[in-house]
């Protein structure tokens, strides 16, 4: 199982056995991130990561151009340049946010129906390559899960303590809704997770990982990876808050998880 983080290199911070790195490839205008947006870049080549670290990227391309094939050449070049260890790709992560109003990209013309076609198109472009394609949601209910089509390489969840979720019950609901309504025996991943309360991070990380590892053990290793998320520019009280280099308990918890992920293949 891959192990890593979004926005920071855990390996450079002293965590051993890091095998994954996640990044959102947002539209940037005048040095500022534009979000939500459906005009994000498609890199000319797969970004370089440290040896042994698999890159996991979220893209936000123009959906109409994508569905008419105008972006196929650029996407094939991007996907085809993934390194030998492969890569992980998704588009419009957390599109299920504000599901009751059609999702958080609906005001930009990316409806749920169109999103399902986008996911299918990108999955087809990744088929036969070294890149695994999937969908990332931020809700566990049926309305959120139905933002995912069947047939993807993986299905991932962003899951945060400050949303005050029913931790295990929520994860079980996500799995059950996927299995009953979208995809039998899905490959699952935790694409982002953290607690905004530093003292709760060790138990939060361990519990979320334990749930995913249990699913993997019960289903022949059908878990792709586990990524924490860090906002280096945010204070305590945001989704994550910054990495705290003196937080020995969290560092120890992540080190243990990394070692377990290395063995869970």
Regions found by a protein language model. Name each.
Residues 1-41:
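Boundary/entry segment of secreted carbohydrate-active catalytic domains
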Residues 2-3, 29-33, 52-58, 86-90, ...:
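Structural preference for beta-strand elements that scaffold enzyme active sites
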Residues 6-13, 35-39, 60-62, 92-96, ...:
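Active-site beta-loop-alpha junctions enriched in small/polar residues
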Residues 6-7, 116-144, 185-199, 224-232:
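Aromatic-lined carbohydrate-recognition surfaces of secreted/lumenal glycan-active proteins
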Residues 8, 85-93, 193-265:
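Substrate-binding cleft of secreted/luminal carbohydrate-active enzymes
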Residues 18-28, 41-56, 73-86, 145-150, ...:
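Acidic (Asp/Glu)-rich catalytic clusters
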Residues 27-30, 34-36, 57, 143-175, ...:
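Aromatic- and acid-rich polysaccharide-binding/catalytic face
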């Amino acid at each position: 199982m891959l192990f890593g983080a979004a926005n920071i290199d855990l390996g450079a911070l002293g965590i051993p056995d890091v095998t994954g790195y996640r990044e959102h490839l947002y539209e940037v205008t005048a040095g500022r991130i534009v979000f939500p947006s459906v005009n994000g870049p498609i890199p000319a080549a797969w970004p370089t990561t440290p040896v042994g670290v698999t890159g996991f990227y979220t893209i936000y391309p123009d959906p109409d151009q994508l569905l008419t094939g105008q972006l196929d050449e650029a996407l094939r070049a991007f996907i085809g340049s993934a390194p030998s260890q492969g890569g992980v790709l998704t588009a419009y992560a957390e599109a299920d946010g504000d599901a009751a109003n059609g999702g958080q990209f609906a005001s930009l013309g990316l409806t749920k129906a169109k999103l399902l076609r986008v996911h299918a198109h990108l999955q087809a472009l990744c088929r036969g390559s070294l890149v695994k394609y999937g969908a990332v949601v931020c809700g566990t209910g049926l309305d959120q899960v139905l933002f995912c089509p069947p047939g993807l390489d993986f299905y991932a969840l962003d899951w945060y303590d400050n949303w005050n979720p029913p931790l295990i019950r929520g994860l079980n609901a996500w799995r059950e809704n996927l299995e009953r309504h979208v995809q039998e025996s899905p490959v699952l991943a935790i694409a982002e997770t953290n607690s905004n309360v530093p003292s709760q991070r060790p138990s939060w990380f361990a519990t979320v990982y334990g749930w995913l590892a249990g699913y993997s053990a019960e289903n022949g290793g059908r878990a792709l990876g586990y990524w924490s998320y860090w906002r280096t520019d945010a204070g305590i009280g945001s989704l994550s808050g910054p990495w705290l280099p003196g937080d020995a308990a969290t560092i120890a918890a992540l080190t243990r998880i990394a070692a377990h992920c290395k063995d869970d293949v």
